[in-house]
């Protein structure tokens, strides 16, 4: 199983196509000579200096170790004029030109995306009336996020039931492109869900009241307005509540494989190696995608198009259109909270069916639920002064420091949990936020492994059959709606998640608490 790319030390990579630019060696990699004066390598990051892109308001920073740095330089070297997306380095610099920006950052898992890189973080100061909110800085899957449930089961308890459990989960939780649930929501229910989020499920007896405590924003963002969500978006979400979707979304049954911080793990109810957990990764489905598309279209048609990159076109946050997008985005985010909550309901019911014990008896408590595609109003210290900001996190996880008032009381001594999913067949991690992260990254860390090669290139270079076979060899029960697409999510298509989380720890923006390995993977 090969992507055609093998990481190596100090490797000089040749361009895919001839580029008529003079090249220069930069820390063992070749880059266009014109870029070199504006790049600085530290032991944990790449600094992109003002001037790399005309109009940059300040330096930008990308957290990376040596191997991840190589990938960034390779992408910069090979970027082509007229391509759909610029290189991740250029996108991070582009964001530093936006009105009101305090700093543009990229996490170690960053890769090119629409407007912002996926893994991009940027805070805009709200004392600047021109500070923008940018749909391309949130992404199309609004409030894509991850939640982790724990159990009191061990791997030895679950091993005899792996195939049965995998089949039942695939049956009970629809996944794949355009999949629908058995329930079609009424207009009234849609409005309630987009307003109340996870609270709606609690009222219906489909989620536990304590789930609200262990969910970012308590599972409901107050400043939302469902009436700003178009009928087209509503139509796409009406029958998708409780569905996984496709792409990198998944449901995994995992075992705790290693505990690095026993005290922090204990606070989360994780006590020993072999303990079984459930990880759910999904977002707002077609509804969120359409909300983003509607407001991208609005921004481009009604605003001055961004001269650096049209994909970065946004609107002033405090303008009427800025507030409309923000409130519609929050409505979609509430739908995503409810979606993950509904999937959790089906997971709890499935475990009860297979193990003949109630979810309460199985200790199926929510450890935490995090967002990683969202923009939020927050306050951060900037040059010693507390500044109100709108913080964009696109493929990045909020990871606030210990004692922060917005995190649950149980986690105040350790910091906000940040759940980091690895590529299919590899490990995942639980991190917590740090005080240093509040200073360096607006309380943000990575969100996953991050793509190394595109889906198209993965399908060209990796055999889906070999991916499925490799999962079998690892003893992982894989349930995938379309096995022909398995190559898109192959391990070789992604960066090494271990390198990503260790880079975050080395940079001081988060700490590793424990590692999980998959036993069952359910994908679209």
From Swiss-Prot:
Cross-referenced SUPFAM superfamilies: Hypothetical protein PH1602
Subunit structure: Catalytic component of the tRNA-splicing ligase complex.
Binding site for Mn(2+) 1: 141, 144, 249
Note describing how the cofactor binds: Binds 2 manganese ions per subunit.
Protein name: RNA-splicing ligase RtcB homolog 1
Additional note from the record: Ligation probably proceeds through 3 nucleotidyl transfer steps, with 2',3'-cyclic phosphate termini being hydrolyzed to 3'-P termini in a step that precedes 3'-P activation with GMP. In the first nucleotidyl transfer step, RTCB reacts with GTP to form a covalent RTCB-histidine-GMP intermediate with release of PPi; in the second step, the GMP moiety is transferred to the RNA 3'-P; in the third step, the 5'-OH from the opposite RNA strand attacks the activated 3'-P to form a 3',5'-phosphodiester bond and release GMP.
Disulfide bonds: none
Cofactor(s) listed in the protein's UniProt record: Mn(2+)
Keywords from the UniProt entry: GTP-binding, Ligase, Manganese, Metal-binding, Nucleotide-binding, tRNA processing
């Amino acid at each position: 199983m090969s992507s055609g790319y093998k990481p190596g030390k100090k490797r000089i990579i040749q361009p895919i196509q001839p580029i008529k630019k003079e090249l220069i060696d930069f820390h063992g990699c070749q880059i266009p000579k014109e870029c070199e004066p504006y790049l600085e390598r530290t032991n944990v990051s790449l600094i992109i200096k003002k001037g790399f892109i005309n109009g940059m308001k300040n330096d930008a920073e990308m957290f990376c170790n040596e191997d991840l740095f190589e990938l960034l330089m390779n992408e910069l070297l090979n970027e082509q004029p007229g391509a759909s997306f610029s290189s991740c380095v250029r996108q991070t610099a582009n964001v530093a030109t936006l009105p009101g920006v305090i700093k543009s950052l990229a996490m170690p898992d960053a890769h090119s995306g629409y407007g912002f890189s996926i893994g991009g973080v940027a805070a805009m100061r709200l004392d600047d009336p021109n500070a923008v909110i940018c749909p391309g800085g949130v992404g199309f899957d609004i409030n894509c996020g991850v939640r982790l449930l724990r159990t009191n089961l061990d791997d030895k308890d679950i091993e005899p039931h792996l195939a049965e459990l995998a089949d039942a989960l695939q049956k009970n939780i629809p996944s794949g492109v355009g999949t629908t649930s058995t329930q079609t929501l009424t207009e009234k229910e849609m409005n309630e869900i987009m307003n109340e989020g996870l609270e709606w499920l609690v009222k219906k007896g489909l989620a536990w009241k304590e789930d609200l405590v262990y969910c970012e924003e308590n599972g409901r963002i107050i400043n939302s307005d469902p009436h700003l969500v178009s009928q087209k978006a509503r139509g796409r979400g009406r029958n998708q509540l409780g569905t996984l979707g496709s792409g990198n979304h998944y449901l995994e049954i995992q075992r705790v494989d290693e505990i690095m911080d026993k005290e922090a793990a204990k606070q989360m109810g994780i006590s020993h190696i072999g303990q079984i957990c459930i990880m759910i990764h999904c977002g707002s489905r077609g509804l969120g995608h359409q909300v983003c598309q509607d407001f991208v279209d609005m921004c481009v048609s009604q605003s001055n198009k961004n001269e650096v990159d049209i994909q970065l076109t946004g609107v002033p946050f405090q303008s009427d259109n800025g507030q409309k997008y923000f409130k519609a985005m929050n409505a979609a985010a509430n739908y995503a909270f409810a979606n993950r909550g509904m999937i959790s309901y089906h997971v709890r019911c499935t475990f009860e069916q297979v193990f003949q014990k109630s979810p309460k008896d199985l200790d199926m408590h929510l450890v935490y639920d995090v967002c990683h595609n969202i923009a939020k109003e927050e306050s951060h210290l900037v040059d010693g002064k507390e500044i109100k900001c709108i913080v964009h996190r696109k493929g990045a996880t909020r990871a606030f420091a210990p004692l922060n008032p917005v995190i649950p009381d149980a986690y105040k001594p350790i910091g906000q949990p940040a759940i980091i999913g690895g590529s299919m067949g590899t490990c995942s991690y639980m991190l917590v936020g740090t005080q240093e992260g509040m200073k360096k990254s607006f309380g943000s860390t990575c969100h996953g492994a991050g793509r190394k090669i595109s889906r198209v290139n993965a399908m060209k270079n990796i055999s889906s059959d070999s991916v499925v076979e490799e999962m079998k060899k690892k003893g992982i029960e894989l349930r995938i709606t379309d096995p022909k697409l398995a190559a898109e999510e192959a391990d070789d298509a992604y960066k090494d998640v271990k390198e990503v989380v260790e880079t975050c720890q080395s940079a001081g923006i988060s700490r590793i608490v424990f590692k999980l390995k998959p036993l069952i993977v359910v994908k679209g």
